[in-house]
Amino acid sequence: MKKKALLGLVTVAGLTLTLAACGGNSSKGTSSSSDSATADTGDFKLKTTNTKEAIKDGTLEIGVVSDTAFTGIFSDAFKDGTLDTTFFSPANEALFNTDKDLKMTDGAAKIKFDEDAKTVTITMTDGVKWSDGKDVNADDLEFPYLVIGNKDYTGVRYDSSMKNIVGMEDYHDGKADTISGIKKVNDKEIQITYKEMTPSMLQNASSGVLGYAMPKHTFDGIAIKDMASSDPVRKNPVTFGPYVISKITAGESVEFTPNKYYYGGTPKLSKIVMKTLPTSSATASMKSKEFDIYEGMPSSEYTSWKDLSGYELLGQQATSYNYIGFKLGKWDSEKGVNVYDSSSKMADKSLRQAIAYAIDNEAIAQKLYNGLQTRANSLIVPAFGTKYDADLKGYTQDVEKAKKLLDDAGYKDTDGDGYREDKNGKKLEINFAFRDGGTTAKSLAEYYIQAWKEVGLDVQLATGRLIEVNSFYDKVQNDDPSIDMYQAGWSTGYDPDQSGLYGEDAQFNFTRFVSDENTKLIKEMSSKDAFDDEKAAKIYKEWQEYANDQAFVIPTTYSFDVTPVSDRVTGYDISRDVDHNVFAEVGITSENR
């Protein structure tokens, strides 16, 4: 391919993102310096500063910025998207709280770990009731394990952490009617016995210790295979959070009223209304003070809304990252494992590495997202402290290195059309799936495709267009053959263990990458050594280096969650170690915004 010096221009929301595409001294990406349009992320607060007394009968209105409808799955056992989590949050409450190290502490239930006996004991606190007035009991603690472990379960949470419970696999295979490793101690307490104790069990996560209960009595007569679409999940969920769902407008809004049985005291609001809001309308909506709280404001428009009067900004670095993934195999639903295909189009790691080196994520984060995102160097997010490898270089733009990797691997332009053929001299066309939504999606996809073109790769949008979010994940999860690689994101939760995302038996391992080394390193994360912080840091460092080299997934950016909150709101605290449901103490102090 003839060398050219090209400049790609991507214009988004009034910003021009200028990126060196290839050639000469422009072959390496440059760090973008901060300017007045870039967020100073150290200025964000975690809690509202309004200390006035809340008025009676107040209504809190929340706008959730999204260009796709929420699915409306109001059950922790079945939901698998952050949008449903958001629309469930005022009514939903976890069993446990979280400390500053993201580890589980007592909450609505008490938890006790016995490493020697390999048991976890969970005890409901007295006075915790479901929103229909019934006590949350031991049956409700056990029930989600019975649902998830059943062979007819339709969700995605039956994985290696569930199989670690003694007797779970026999129950799943139909050899037993109960899980032998789970016993009811009394009406309020269960004890779970595990094959091995793992560090992930200490995290506020779902690594064998579920952080939620299910109201067993509301599912009487409903087959497990039908639960995900049943009324207790879709229409009238029974919960024990501060509010209860009172009205659902499918895909658009949810209304909440106080849960009169809430164990944490009487909520301060008479109603919460949560609505979806298109990205294109978000800034205008905030200017008109339509909502009290805005979830998911577009970072690409940060300069347009960051200084609007009547709001203060709460924010912190998210436990999430965006990434580019490669389809490298299939999910075997019969065996419950990922099957790697060494002959798949994207199987050559040099091709994957070249794709990573061709793009400038530093510039994207600074220019496109106004500093509310940063270049990601690892699949472990910085919030995990010593387990995060800050010294890992990751992938910074180096166009010449990308070209050399492709040349050395045998991807060469043999017909002079500007695009490289595969190693066998056949046409190489890479189908790239990209989620629709937001003001930046189309332009970012176009930038990526242009950047890859400059190193000689013919990348096209799978289906020929951006894909609606729900359809996108359906295609990716079901290994649609029209997709070779895709752009997506993960909200990691509070557990750094990677078995649930990249393990051999993880359905969420959408790349389907499997290797003996990857499996070995991931298993070490749940070993006895990993209980020691120093040893755990070494284990995680080794896996991060391996994942970076294999490049089955390319982390692109980390982000900051920034939430504008009306000055009339009091008691709203987004700290991860807050000891109550985030809406339990929220009130408003005036009639008008």
Report the location of each language-model feature.
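Extracytoplasmic/peripheral linker and loop segments enriched in polar/acidic and small residues
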Residues: T48, E53, Q353, D458-N470, ...
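N-terminal lobe/hinge region of extracytoplasmic solute-binding protein
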Residues: E61-E115
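Aromatic- and charge-enriched surface segment that lines or borders ligand/interaction sites
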Residues: L83, A109-R157, S285, S344-M346
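Surface-exposed binding/hinge segments that line
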Residues: Y158-D220
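Gly/Pro-rich hinge or "lid" segments in bacterial periplasmic/extracellular proteins
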Residues: S206-G264, K271
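Ligand-site clamp/hinge motif
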Residues: A228-R234, P258-W305, D458
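Append "and occasionally in soluble cytosolic enzymes with long acidic Gly/Pro-rich linkers
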Residues: S343-Q450, N592
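Long beta-strand-rich cores associated with HINT superfamily self-processing modules
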Residues: V565-R593
